[in-house]
Amino acid sequence: MIFDSLISLIPISMIMVGCCSNVISLELIMKQSQSHAILVTFFQFATVAFISFFVNIRWKQVFSIFWIPIGLRERKIPLKTYFLMVSIFFILSVLNNKALDCDIPIPFHMIFRSSSLLSTIVIGSIFYRKSYSKQQILSLIMVTLGIIFATFSSMPDSKKEISLGHEPNLLRFSIGMLMLIAAMFLSSILGLIQEHTYKLYGKDRHYETIFYSHLFSLPFFLLFKDDILHHIQLNNDSALMALPFGFGSFPTLWVYLIVNVLTQYVCIQGVFILTGKTSTLTCTLVISIRKFLSIIISVIYFNNHFTSLLFTGTILVFLGTFMYSTSGKVIEKPLPPTKQVKEIEKEKKLN
């Protein structure tokens, strides 16, 4: 059996339905207004922080009937670590969504975001002294080639654009590419920081990390206050959509945005639950299948351009990622313990 148990079908369903619906709703928003990236990011962060807040509350039973909140769960990870993670997380999230404002096609956007293996290996080998097997190096080469093929297939035809007087399209695409590259490396750095943090404080800290990383990011959106207010007005002015079951009508962009933020939370929770209940191989396989389905839906439903070169790049990225997940453990050369590690180990011995 590929799946470890029938219980894993629940998070798999959450990933397939939640993540695919999230991509569809995002593309529906971007089709109507390409400049909605910041508003979408803000509502995603606010929604996840709000829902996660209730997961992090400590409850006390009263009279064997009622439960009352008595405060937040004890936070194990220090604030300075969260500040570092939040800063990186906020910047990469904004970069990923803002890249969609720069003529980056949704299928290419999904493929590129699936290729973080490249930056993870580069950063891991340079800063964390990790060594990789031949199969892992081969996986890296495949992913790199996949990125190159996908990039060339998605680039605007410069000769055609110049002849039409649309030179900015190629420039915008290049800016979007730089945003995605920066976000890819930041994502890998964040992943390695989280991996190190979970080693120190326990792997069961994900509910805490989700809450604080989104909550502490919200003040940063004050930098984009005018942009957010402008797009809230655009949402209010969008065409009305008839709601099912006789609930009247509601502005279309608000409907898409609500669906987007709710499905993103379902998607995130599905990934976390699946990671805890199945093997890394199963998790990687499910996520890769989900991303491939999202690309197919984007191409068919939204009539996005999908060349043979882009298809080849897609296969190389997913196959390379799958090979890497089956290649065994990465060998880490021991680093000298930091002051923080020494303090934690000393505390464990005393307890």
Curated annotation (Swiss-Prot):
Domain of life: Eukaryota
GO biological process: UDP-N-acetylglucosamine transmembrane transport
One protein family per Pfam: UAA
Disulphide connectivity of cysteines: none
Cross-referenced InterPro entries: SCL35B1-4/HUT1 (IPR013657)
Membrane topology: Multi-pass membrane protein
This protein's record includes keyword Zinc-finger: no
GO CC terms: endoplasmic reticulum membrane; Golgi membrane
Record-stated family: Belongs to the nucleotide-sugar transporter family. SLC35B subfamily.
Job of this protein: Sugar transporter that specifically mediates the transport of UDP-N-acetylglucosamine (UDP-GlcNAc) from cytosol into Golgi.
Protein name: UDP-N-acetylglucosamine transporter slc35b4
